[in-house]
């Protein structure tokens, strides 16, 4: 390695093969803050980093199309400055199986920039055929990585850590143990070395990617993507992971279209698209601070959930159940027949039972208020489509605890088993289609210009799930309910009438024993009528 007149490192790259590849091998390959020039010109040429540089005699038969920089030492590469291709633009590949650390790195006059922990494999003509990735991490820190001087940036690595910004025209990261075809990007999943990393791709809160197009692909089984940073594309964002996607509350994923395929999608951040958000995962969870915004939103999985905090909701359910039990015990204490008391001790014991039950009730009530206050302080998750919202779940759709499903036009919710709206809002400014064997609406609101589907065409059932409801857990045919589309919950006819039952008795024929004791038979036309049982 030489130096230009201003001290910038100057690499006189090797002559290209018949396949157009300049293959350069180093014990160590590091780029200092002042940068480095890869000389791809036979004649003296002007550069941004080093001014005029002398010609590279190795280029006497033609320049390289691809410049490969292979590291063999077992030590990671540090890219702390820009790499500039002098002369004709070429693709630049930095390959180090032991890792690459970027802190202020970048590219100038580069066709395609590739950072990889893979080992290059060449064809018989010396062309670069594949990159075999089995280990290593590419990490971006500090001043980040500016690849806007390249047509595209590709990172091929076992795992990636993004702790700073990445800027590119087009940016792609492929993680996992893979053999990747250099020309087409086609990949074959292989077995990695040295055990699995914790996650395939980790984007910290201070990290981010900014490009016209972004694609992130993780192939290693069970490994996912964790992002608390920012992914912004003027065009499409594609994210595919064999494991889970966890977008934390400070995370932002935003593009013209956002497409996600993962084993599990768990969102606490913002996922937004000008046109369409499409998520396909076994379980899709939008919770707490989670926001899904798009022109259209399409979700497909086994279970789709939109709720604040499931653990806190269950805690509230337990607290309410305990309060109900305390209320029943207090009623029992008050319900003792004081006319049967025969001593002062009986009255004293009665008062003590009431006092004990009252204290227990107050304690349980405070517990409910505490959990409720905690939930009230939490933000509510939202899935909102300016146009159409479509949810297809093989098992269930859950919208709970102040969450909201919204569509500016039509909404289609389909579930193999249940659609649950519990203390939440489902609103469509167009037509709403609900298709599921069981639709549960507890302290929730449905609102739509027109509701169709399961409620009007299917012989489906509705389960009552309101806390302390006397019929909670029981399932009834939907035609036993009224106000299904009112937006304020449904009413079960049986429950409503039973509320008045204690005030009336139904006239019945006396039993044989009662007639024998002197009771008079009742005219048949009177049997079944109600009669007030109060004065």
Each predicted region: which residue ranges?
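Solvent-exposed adhesion/ligand-recognition segments of exported proteins
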Residues: 1-233, 240
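Binding/recognition "hotspot" determinant
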Residues: 135-139, 191, 195-200, 222, ...
